[in-house]
Amino acid sequence: MSSKVIVTIFGASGDLAKRKLYPSLFRLYQSGNLSKHFAVIGTARRPWSKEYFESVVVESILDLADSTEQAQEFASHFYYQSHDVNDSEHYIALRQLQAELNEKYQAEHNKLFFLSMAPQFFGTIAKHLKSENIVDGKGFERLIVEKPFGTDYATASKLNDELLATFDEEQIFRIDHYLGKEMIQSIFAVRFANLIFENVWNKDFIDNVQITFAERLGVEERGGYYDQSGALRDMVQNHTLQLLSLLAMDKPASFTKDEIRAEKIKVFKNLYHPTDEELKEHFIRGQYRSGKIDGMKYISYRSEPNVNPESTTETFTSGAFFVDSDRFRGVPFFFRTGKRLTEKGTHVNIVFKQMDSIFGEPLAPNILTIYIQPTEGFSLSLNGKQVGEEFNLAPNSLDYRTDATATGASPEPYEKLIYDVLNNNSTNFSHWDEVCASWKLIDRIEKLWAENGAPLHDYKAGSMGPQASFDLLEKFGAKWTWQPDITYRQDGRLE
């Protein structure tokens, strides 16, 4: 059913809006989820006209449109207001424009606000939305905020309090685009729609879980931002722990947003808080030095533009989380994430316990691999007999990949997540309880590192991280399942 809504985007001139938001809204328009009864108000400091704003929107969607006319018709629903987030008069003008558009498009007073700006402006915007009576209790009123949601627990808590002065928790949608990816959402299907997995998805059968977010790129033009953030804040506090919660949660009573969210929150509340000594042993950090991949030489992190040449910011982090629940108590959830690694990819490996062998030789563990990007799909390794006269065993892989046609037809993450917000489905968004629990644990690791309580390991560009990451798993009697650097070295592609 087509949504009736006025969407207001704060930060409408920014890169995210052009690359993600306008194309996602257009796909919703093409699919009929947005039709006649919607309008988009773009706000930013730049003094754009409506005509110029429309041209920006058309340019961002032209490759997706069936015709120029279709793109222009969609863009005609867009309106622009030059806006200073600190100026009350600008909010009064925004309220008047919203009222006019609500009447013109018969949007039934439904409002969606998207804060595509730096978090330090979130509280100011929320305060003015209430004081200038833009949030007036008529129709639905929902707020989407981009990460990062704070830089630690204290800033996140302050930000949350500022938003709660205007919006209820149920109205706030903290977006994490990774949760909009098709295969992450398919984890529910793999787990709960297949008896062979759900019955063994516990500490009795699973030895360890491995989560890898690998990037081949360096920090690129984000050096200034990244040097103040680092891999732990940038990737672990949100993406990694959100993915972990989907893997570790108990089966919800029903497939509803409230039941799913309740089970996810339980995982965050059950995250084991290590002792100080365990923190030093279970979490490592690294920083890339120069290296060569496929004949291309890459500079070290400290040589990147806008990066402190003596920086101690981590570009790689690895560790072991534990969930103190009946289902997974004692099972390590290993993670690693880093820049300038061998190959781009997001993989989850569920490593099952090894069976006692009756064949006189050790058996390889069964491994379920979930491929999230760049390819989507999953594989399951099983032990089988090798072809030949002798009875020799070898692991075989049952492999499935989503074909390009299906992948191309599936919604983009932002499209799916905006669709969810329009339909008041908060399943794939972070509740404050999740954010709170994750920051409290991440803050302890950050504090240890800030006090130089753990070494900063270096690793060569093109590798899969420092040796300490591999040593960490060995301490638990495990090893990383995905090691593309081995093949690259064998092929002479790494130096």
Curated annotation (Swiss-Prot):
This enzyme catalyses: D-glucose 6-phosphate + NADP(+) = 6-phospho-D-glucono-1,5-lactone + NADPH + H(+)
State the top-level EC class. oxidoreductase
Q: In which pathway does it act?
A: Carbohydrate degradation; pentose phosphate pathway; D-ribulose 5-phosphate from D-glucose 6-phosphate (oxidative stage): step 1/3
What cellular component GO annotations does this protein have?
Answer: cytosol
This protein's name: Glucose-6-phosphate 1-dehydrogenase
Similarity comment text for this entry: Belongs to the glucose-6-phosphate dehydrogenase family.
Q: Give EC number(s), comma-separated.
A: 1.1.1.49
Q: Which InterPro entries does the annotation name?
A: G6P_DH, G6P_DH_AS, G6P_DH_C, G6P_DH_NAD-bd, NAD(P)-bd_dom_sf
Gene Ontology molecular functions: glucose-6-phosphate dehydrogenase activity; NADP binding
> Do you know which Pfam families this protein is assigned to?
G6PD_C, G6PD_N
Keyword list (alphabetical) reads: Carbohydrate metabolism, Glucose metabolism, NADP, Oxidoreductase
What is this protein's function per UniProt? Catalyzes the oxidation of glucose 6-phosphate to 6-phosphogluconolactone.
- Tell me one GO biological process term: pentose-phosphate shunt, oxidative branch
Quick one: which residues bind substrate? 177, 181, 215, 234, 339, 344
Where is NADP(+) annotated to bind?
Answer: 11-18, 45, 84-85, 147
Which positions are catalytic residues?
239
Originating gene: zwf
